[in-house]
Amino acid sequence: MGVHECPAWLWLLLSLLSLPLGLPVLGAPPRLICDSRVLERYLLEAKEAENITTGCAEHCSLNENITVPDTKVNFYAWKRMEVGQQAVEVWQGLALLSEAVLRGQALLVNSSQPWEPLQLHVDKAVSGLRSLTTLLRALGAQKEAISPPDAASAAPLRTITADTFRKLFRVYSNFLRGKLKLYTGEACRTGDR
């Protein structure tokens, strides 16, 4: 059986096995993110990370304010946006969220007694964000974000701050459930991606 004869389910399985490692999914179908099970896996990980920090006070403080994307969505305005504008907002939000989680990871590593369950979920979030970035790049989100039709009218990314890992993971979870899911749904529906 040649590479080109490989069934689609095998590509999906191989791709999903590569995702937790944060490795680029080379040779995978470019629309893998369009499979709802893929995004649901990341949503589940984000929700687990948020849940692990419930009631956690001592180990869950970031000891500084970290800037994260505001995850509120005005659905009326979102539906009226061009896909390119949506891509800009998602791409900028994903980049800022990745920076925030990496900063949280650095703070946790430098703490005197990092809490292992928290460290595990932070590491998973870093890996997940890298994989999502790769999947969005394969979908063409980066290309759309660089050259939307009316880039001059793009509003600056709204931000908030997180001072605990719970809030950081809540933003992560909400971003995936909100803007990322809305964007990928629209981008996957259109046939020219």
From Swiss-Prot:
One of its GO terms (cellular component) is extracellular region. The gene is EPO. GO terms for molecular function: cytokine activity; erythropoietin receptor binding; hormone activity; protein kinase activator activity. Produced by kidney or liver of adult mammals and by liver of fetal or neonatal mammals. Changing S127E: Decreased erythrocyte proliferation; impaired EPOR dimerization following binding. This is Erythropoietin. Hormone involved in the regulation of erythrocyte proliferation and differentiation and the maintenance of a physiological level of circulating erythrocyte mass. Binds to EPOR leading to EPOR dimerization and JAK2 activation thereby activating specific downstream effectors, including STAT1 and STAT3. Changing D70N: In ECYT5; uncertain significance. Keywords: Congenital erythrocytosis, Disease variant, Disulfide bond, Erythrocyte maturation, Glycoprotein, Hormone, Pharmaceutical, Secreted, Signal. Disulfide bonds join C34-C188, C56-C60. One of its GO terms (biological process) is myeloid cell apoptotic process. It is linked to Microvascular complications of diabetes 2: Pathological conditions that develop in numerous tissues and organs as a consequence of diabetes mellitus. They include diabetic retinopathy, diabetic nephropathy leading to end-stage renal disease, and diabetic neuropathy. Diabetic retinopathy remains the major cause of new-onset blindness among diabetic adults. It is characterized by vascular permeability and increased tissue ischemia and angiogenesis.
